[in-house]
Amino acid sequence: RQERLAKLFTEAVRRWDVSFTENLPDYMKELVSFFRKGWEDYLLGYYEEAEWLAAEYVPSLDEYIK
């Protein structure tokens, strides 16, 4: 059972397919959601940096850290 859950969890994270989490316990569903949100925030940060670069804008330290 644990091995099956581990495989389901790993596939859910790899695919980012929320429907793939249907057979996971609630705590694992929350982890998939947490990882997905973290990845989204990470990518949005890079997107903002790319916009700054394209506009030749140098953000303040506070903007950059945010």
Swiss-Prot record:
A UniProt-annotated Pfam family: Terpene_syn_C_2
Gene Ontology molecular function, alphabetical: alpha-bisabolene synthase activity; metal ion binding
E.C. number: 4.2.3.38
Cellular component aspect of the GO annotation: cytoplasm
Catalytic activities: (2E,6E)-farnesyl diphosphate = (E,R)-alpha-bisabolene + diphosphate
Needed co-factor(s): Mn(2+); K(+)
Protein name listed in UniProt: Alpha-bisabolene synthase
Principal location listed in the UniProt entry: cytoplasm
Protein's UniProt keywords contain Cytoplasm: yes
Subcellular localization: Cytoplasm
Source species of the chain: Pseudotsuga menziesii (Douglas-fir)
Superkingdom as given in the UniProt entry: Eukaryota
Leader sequence segment: none
Keyword RNA-binding: no
Keyword set, alphabetical order: Cytoplasm, Lyase, Manganese, Metal-binding
Pathway, per record: Terpene metabolism; oleoresin biosynthesis
Protein family per UniProt: Belongs to the terpene synthase family. Tpsd subfamily.
Functional summary from the UniProt entry: Involved in defensive oleoresin formation in conifers in response to insect attack or other injury. Involved in sesquiterpene (C15) olefins biosynthesis.
